[in-house]
Amino acid sequence: MRVLVTGATGFTGGHLARALAAKGDEVTALVREKAAEQDGVRVIHGDLRDPAALAAATAGIEIVYNIAAIYRQAGTATETYRAVNAVAVRDLIEAAARHGVKRVVHCSTVGVHGDVEHPPASEDAPLKPGDVYQESKLEGERLAREAGQRLGIEVTIARPSGIYGPGDRRLLKLFRGIARRRWITLGDGEIYYHLTYIDDLVAGFRLCGEHTAAANRTYILAGGEVTTLNALVGLVADAAGVPEPVWHLPAWPFWVAGAACEVICAPLGVEPPLFRRRVDFFTKSRAFDISRARAEIGFDPRVSLREGIRKTLDWYRANRWL
């Protein structure tokens, strides 16, 4: 299979590109940064916003996996989020259609559902993004579907939840704080949390790309276990061989402080030392229903939370990230 992976220099895209190459696919990666060809992956340098780069990258491709996105970055303009996470998605699908690509798998996020009031949330749960990043991802979904219907190309939307694993930086602070015995939980810690180990997510992406039933469908891809934040902290502490943290502080003063930091730092284009989104980690439940993906395409996450945490922590230690 001839496949294109965008965002292949990132955590998720990199794992996907290497896995596809390992199983025998001819993998092309469209990347912005200078990167040498490795692990059987052919590299094309370019930007999703560049029509010439899209044309070169999609020529001769059968399946496109669009993993590239701009994540939350201080000082990033709303229009930049929209240009990369929405408009460029449409442009990529149009380029793919012109070159006869069969299917585009677009990586969105469960964040398009916003704060889940009645967990677990399915793909049909209300869509109410809570920030500019989530809004841009939701618009990307809409533009992707519209382009697919207009051009007659198959488009599959994947909404991952809480991605983690070797090489991930987003949960590094959690692991590092617990391993160094400096972790304090804000709130009671009884919110739900739903993580997805990277190997399971990669398997889900492949099913989205290759399974006949996945054409023009939307799937939540998440791990097989839902846990509470307290239980998650306990699992990390156990894997790290340290006592489980017991300190808790009220969350609301930190949320207020985060709001103030955002107001002060945003005009300066610097990342706030504390922001509301970070406090939301402690206060908003995230639990999702993956029964559609299980039933329709055979998605079957196999890495237990305990095993995934151990593998991730071992990698952090081996690479001296902890």
PLM region spans:
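Flexible, glycine-rich beta-alpha linker
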Residues: G114, I153-L172
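Active-site Tyr-X1-5-Lys
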Residues: G130-T156
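Substrate-positioning beta->alpha
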Residues: E139, D168-K173, G187-G209, N216-R217, ...
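NAD(P)H-binding glycine-rich loop region in Rossmannoid oxidoreductase-like domains
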Residues: A35, H45-R90, A95, V110-D115
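Conserved Rossmann-fold NAD(P)-dependent oxidoreductase catalytic core, especially the SDR/UDP-sugar
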Residues: D91-Y133
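Amphipathic terminal alpha-helices
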Residues: R292-A295, D300, S304-L322
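Mid/C-terminal beta-alpha module of Rossmann-like enzyme folds, strongest
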Residues: L207-L274, I290, R306, R310-K311
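N-terminal Rossmann NAD(P)H-binding glycine-rich loop of SDR-like oxidoreductase domains
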Residues: V3-K23
